[in-house]
Amino acid sequence: MGKVRIGFYALTSCYGCQLQLAMMDELLQLIPNAEIVCWFMIDRDSIEDEKVDIAFIEGSVSTEEEVELVKKIRENAKIVVAVGACAVQGGVQSWSEKPLEELWKKVYGDAKVKFQPKKAEPVSKYIKVDYNIYGCPPEKKDFLYALGTFLIGSWPEDIDYPVCLECRLNGHPCILLEKGEPCLGPVTRAGCNARCPGFGVACIGCRGAIGYDVAWFDSLAKVFKEKGMTKEEIIERMKMFNGHDERVEKMVEKIFSGGEQ
């Protein structure tokens, strides 16, 4: 059996996810079993149009050129993995509700650029994604678990419980109930070991909403409302890393429209 061919690809992002991966000494242990055939951040001579067994994609789709790139990656890869908040949820750059033209003008002014811009969107908007690695940046253990599982021919399990569970297991005081801060732990996918609450900081939801339709934004919005937050403040808070989750505005609106008292 030959080596597993792996490719790392970057779209619109801060490159923090790739940097996190590049700094992992454990990658050297892959050499006997895997071949990295594309990683432009590490090797500028990398060719993106290569057949691979596993493709790891970082960043949100923000240009027409990137739409074509992810489609080509999907054609070439047996398994596609979205890595990090930008690739999985669209990232903080997809948070704003302002018109694209206004945002473009603010960033680039009158400068001419060679690419065609579009609103930042998750990779799954354009191609089938087989597995997600969450976080901003992702946890090293999550990447190693996923990759190691793929290499032995199995499939990694997804995380389906909230940050609150890890918070309780670690014995942290509840940021939401005890400090009264707008913590998103109840609706955010776990896996970070409740790092921010562990330091007394409210979760901002960088790992995205829990899957399987169990992210109850409405229940949390009710708590936020009781603490004096406006509808706009709640939506802004919840959409920071969930800009493309249609449930947010619908569920928050239900609380403020009298749908739930």
Curated annotation (Swiss-Prot):
Pfam families: Oxidored_q6. Optimum temperature is greater than 95 degrees Celsius for hydrogenase activity. Stable up to 100 degrees Celsius. Loses 50% of activity at 80 degrees Celsius after 21 hour incubation. GO terms for cellular component: cytoplasm. [4Fe-4S] cluster 1 binds at residues 14, 17, 86, 136. The keyword Transmembrane does not apply. Its cofactor is Ni(2+); [4Fe-4S] cluster; [3Fe-4S] cluster. One of its GO terms (molecular function) is hydrogen dehydrogenase (NADP+) activity. Gene3D superfamilies: NADH:ubiquinone oxidoreductase-like, 20kDa subunit. It is found in: Cytoplasm. Part of a bifunctional enzyme complex that functions as an NADPH-dependent hydrogen-evolving hydrogenase with sulfur reducing activity. May play a role in hydrogen cycling during fermentative growth. Activity not exhibited with NAD. The alpha and delta subunits form the hydrogenase component that catalyzes the reduction of protons to evolve hydrogen. Belongs to the [NiFe]/[NiFeSe] hydrogenase small subunit family. Heterotetramer of alpha, beta, gamma and delta subunits. The nickel-containing alpha and delta subunits constitute the hydrogenase activity. The beta and gamma subunits (flavin-containing dimer) constitute the sulfur reductase activity. This is Sulfhydrogenase 1 subunit delta. It comes from Pyrococcus furiosus (strain ATCC 43587 / DSM 3638 / JCM 8422 / Vc1).
